[in-house]
Amino acid sequence: MIDFKKEVIDRSFEMPIVVDFWAPWCGPCRILGPVIEQIATEQEGQWALVKLNTEEQEEISYQYGIRSIPNVKMFYRGEVIDEFTGALPRQMILEWLKKGLPKPGLIALDQLLAEHANPEATAVESLLERYPDSPEIRIVLSQLILWDQPAKVIEILEPVKMGTPYYDKASHLREIASFLCMSVDDAEIMEIQDLIKGGHLHEVLPKIITTLGKNPKVADGQLAKAAIGIFQTLGTQHELTKAYRKQLDMVLWA
């Protein structure tokens, strides 16, 4: 028997874990087993294989809804992120792994964030140099340097194109950065820019709402886009979103 929490759940925070749910009496399991074991050996270091005998660990099998075997589930950061049932041929398993495995850049980023909840921007920049194709790293780095280096944020996020999973997040960050990069001679807008750059969101959000209440299209509409971007970036559960988002919607859409 395996220690499921230790060997699967806990370890999945370090790397993806693929669990093969099988039983000795299962013919298709005997077909799948050697194939997936060989692939695990070939791809050692990218993910780890754990074999779970459903006859020995019925409670775990029930917990994960195993009704037909062989069943293969991919765990990452404690959650099932993909699965298949049946004795798939080698090529289909390889395609499943290619599609479902978290990219190396995301794994490296998750490891960094697990060690440092608030990492230095330089550490994330180093990751981006190693994994330039990782949109997740681009998003996190942009969030870290947004107030100080908005022009660089626009550059960093340029490769995140429409139709990709992180496009919406990138767009909101770009809207904020674009507003901060604007050259204006309006003292009120300049003050708002300075407050945002200083990270004084508690102070600036009421000012933004007041300014937009007078003219929703001020600063060529960029202030409104930046305000929406700030709330989207903070998330719906953030205290500032709860306090001010409805007020923003009222001045923009009333």
Where in the sequence are the language-model features?
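Short pre-active-site segment immediately N-terminal to redox-active cysteine/selenocysteine motifs
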Residues: 15, 22-25, 68
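Hydrophobic beta-strand anchors of alpha/beta hydrolase catalytic cores
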Residues: 18-19, 49, 72
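The canonical Cys-X-X-Cys-His
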Residues: 26-29, 72
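Typically the conserved alpha-helix immediately C-terminal to a functionally engaged Cys/Sec
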Residues: 28-44, 52
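Non-catalytic, surface beta->alpha helical segment in thiol-disulfide oxidoreductase systems
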Residues: 67-108
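Non-globular targeting/processing and membrane-anchoring segments
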Residues: 86, 98-254
